[in-house]
A protein has these predicted regions:
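Hydrophobic/aromatic-rich alpha-helical bundle segments in the mid-to-C-terminal region
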Residues: 112-123, 134-179
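Helix-turn-helix
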Residues: 6-9, 13-51, 55
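Short, basic, alpha-helical segments at the C-terminal edge of helix-turn-helix-like DNA-binding modules
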Residues: 58-64
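Hydrophobic alpha-helical connector segments
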Residues: 55, 69-96, 145-148
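Amphipathic alpha-helical segments used for helix-helix packing
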Residues: 91-116
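N-terminal intrinsically disordered/low-complexity leader segments
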Residues: 1-5
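Short hydrophobic clusters on alpha-helical segments that form packing/core surfaces
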Residues: 10-18, 60, 87, 152
């Protein structure tokens, strides 16, 4: 592997599989095949599927949090548009959905630790929006952080399931319309 550790390559392959087919369909054998190693080598880095799933969500949450920190919040409309763009990028990436949307859809059948980490991802997003609303109280009238996150995640699932990206676009346009009022 040039420039990337085997552990990162395994995480990349596992994330792609979860985002496309779901956590329950991801197997160590398939991930190993994607990376070009034996499944025992995947177990070396991640002894259990739960360990791999937890590491996936932690990494995804960290990357997303870093992107949130890069958003300049001095202009409410621009900041909200950049937030929505992060979700849009997750939908467009490999024509799949946000990792945590995929895991959230399977939440009743995944391990407790993965479910907790997935919930933490959503809380990071909600808290970021709440902070933005506190910075711009007159601009945020009528907006709720949980409504925005739930709407974007739901629209992502709907767009992915039906193949109609316009569903996501309609929801994001409605959210951003509030910045023009």
């Amino acid at each position: 592997m040039t420039g990337k550790s085997m552990k990162e390559a395994i995480l990349d392959a596992a994330e792609k599989r979860v985002r496309h087919a779901g956590y329950s369909k991801m197997s160590f054998r398939d991930v190993a095949k994607d990376v070009g190693i034996k499944s025992a080598s995947v177990h070396y880095h991640f002894p259990t599927k739960s360990d791999l799933g937890t590491a996936l969500v932690e990494r995804y949450k960290d990357h997303f949090s870093q992107k949130l920190l890069q958003i300049d919040t001095t202009n409410f409309a621009d900041a909200l548009a950049q937030f929505v763009q992060l979700y849009d990028a997750a939908l467009v990436m490999d024509q799949s959905i946000c990792l945590c949307a995929a895991l959230g859809a399977e939440s009743m059948g995944i391990e407790k630790q993965i479910r907790a980490e997935t919930g933490d991802f959503f809380q990071v997003n909600i808290k970021w929006l709440q902070n933005l609303f506190r910075l711009h109280p007159t601009k945020a009238t009528g907006l709720e952080a949980t409504d925005i996150v739930a709407s974007l995640e739901g629209a992502m699932l709907l767009a992915s399931t039906t193949g109609h990206r316009t569903y996501f676009q309609k929801v994001s346009d409605r959210i951003l319309h509030h910045t023009k009022i």
